[in-house]
């Protein structure tokens, strides 16, 4: 029997999403204009909360759809303008180029990455040392590469690992739907579940590693560049200025990695099942045996392109996205990928997230137009100089957990610079505030996927449903890191930042401009 027109429309709306989720979004769309007529400020914060809700429910429905509907309505009712959204997109063009090209570029280096990380995984049998190595590697790479790039690398490796075992467990040699477990025996499902736990922990260690390394250098995160430019610091200056906070945080973060693995807290401690290790070992042995001279040349070419990638990013020879485009061109040309559809597969992972980030910029435009953060900024600047450092750090951390890091860092450094230029604070205090702003923006934001773009990218990637990594589970697994990084960072800002910076100046390592 044919269903009614209304029922058909309801089923099509947001597809397979639960009915309660569809109803909640409709209520949001009805309530927002009414609240906006009464209080634009309250409506602005309500929109932010609703957008966070769509991110939290990412596994129910990709946030681009509900978030996009909320953003379109916000522009339509006047919470912001289409022109302001365009300005925000233009201001963040580098980030969009990064997502479009750098993430796609990594796709053409997956053979090399899978080769390297397979050897790493098979050669290190201790889960603690393996977790530490993933965390350290991610931290080191994130000091030179964008965190999204590093996470994209680890995601591609994890999907490769998962795909290898899933094909064996399902007794299928060709590419299959990795989310389809219907052909897997009960015994294999138990092992697969343990393997998922193992991959979840590695992904979280690597994700936190990107935050540990990304905060240390001016090229580690997009907002770092903005803060460095506002303070007039170069690469070495930035590293030394941040080190009184970032070095102790890095050490404590790595110790936390070992601790949660040792004690099996917060969902960590799952080891690589021996059956999976055997499958990966067989795959590695078979791959090496079947590797032709042409395959070896591909690996060598990818390694050379990897050297070019790190060198170009470290020396900042061009914008990150353009370097990513050069990786695509070099890799496809030298490896021999010439078919348009084969090249197009590289963009499958990144473009939905690029669209989602563009929607997020419209929410940022609402935050600016409705001055949602103004009361907080005014409160902080009225405090004493000593209290300002901790307050800037704390409020940056709180806002960065629910908003865009680049936006929060930009707003605070601009306000601090304006206060310095007006004479409200000294140049020396401004430089200390720049450190507090940068560390406060980067460290506590690991608390939620909303705060770290790399975490959000992981949550909305094809890998997340495969390893059962939901929003809530990600927040839970990030909790020990959140507590350690936030508290150690706060203590360093409070007690070590000023005296160590003063000592650096006396040694002549840094100077006030």
UniProtKB/Swiss-Prot annotation:
The keyword Transmembrane helix applies. InterPro entries: Na+/H+_antiporter_NhaB. It is found in: Cell inner membrane. It comes from the Bacteria. Na(+)/H(+) antiporter that extrudes sodium in exchange for external protons. HAMAP family: NhaB. This is Na(+)/H(+) antiporter NhaB. It comes from Shigella sonnei (strain Ss046). The gene is nhaB.
